[in-house]
Amino acid sequence: MKSCLINVSLLILLLLPILGYASVNAESIDGENDFEEERGFGCFRSCWKAGHDDKTCKSMCG
């Protein structure tokens, strides 16, 4: 029983860094997506301020 608890404890200690890395990686991916959306919106906003219509802005900004 004692060796089983030791094995489980070691397994948990090995998995914690992997889960931590996955969490940090997921947050950075979310940040990149937010940046892409913000940049795209900025493009549309600038396009509209320049007096272009929606169709032209969509072709220019993607």
Swiss-Prot record:
<feature type="site" description="Basic residue of the functional dyad">
    <location>
        <position position="58"/>
    </location>
</feature>
<feature type="site" description="Aromatic residue of the functional dyad">
    <location>
        <position position="44"/>
    </location>
</feature>
<keyword id="KW-1015">Disulfide bond</keyword>
<feature type="disulfide bond">
    <location>
        <begin position="47"/>
        <end position="57"/>
    </location>
</feature>
<keyword id="KW-0732">Signal</keyword>
<dbReference type="GO" id="GO:0090729">
    <property type="term" value="F:toxin activity"/>
</dbReference>
<keyword id="KW-0964">Secreted</keyword>
<comment type="similarity">
    <text>Belongs to the short scorpion toxin superfamily. Potassium channel inhibitor kappa-KTx family. Kappa-KTx 1 subfamily.</text>
</comment>
<dbReference type="GO" id="GO:0099106">
    <property type="term" value="F:ion channel regulator activity"/>
</dbReference>
<keyword id="KW-0872">Ion channel impairing toxin</keyword>
<dbReference type="Pfam" id="PF08095">
    <property type="entry name" value="Toxin_25"/>
</dbReference>
<comment type="function">
    <text>Shows structural homology with WaTx suggesting that it acts as a cell-penetrating peptide (CPP) with defensive purpose that induces pain by specifically activating mammalian sensory neuron TRPA1 channels. Has no effect on the voltage-gated potassium channels tested.</text>
</comment>
<feature type="signal peptide">
    <location>
        <begin position="1"/>
        <end position="26"/>
    </location>
</feature>
<dbReference type="GO" id="GO:0005576">
    <property type="term" value="C:extracellular region"/>
</dbReference>
<dbReference type="InterPro" id="IPR012630">
    <property type="entry name" value="Toxin_25"/>
</dbReference>
<feature type="disulfide bond">
    <location>
        <begin position="43"/>
        <end position="61"/>
    </location>
</feature>
<protein>
    <recommendedName>
        <fullName>Potassium channel toxin kappa-KTx 1.4</fullName>
    </recommendedName>
</protein>
<keyword id="KW-0528">Neurotoxin</keyword>
<keyword id="KW-0800">Toxin</keyword>
<feature type="propeptide">
    <location>
        <begin position="27"/>
        <end position="38"/>
    </location>
</feature>
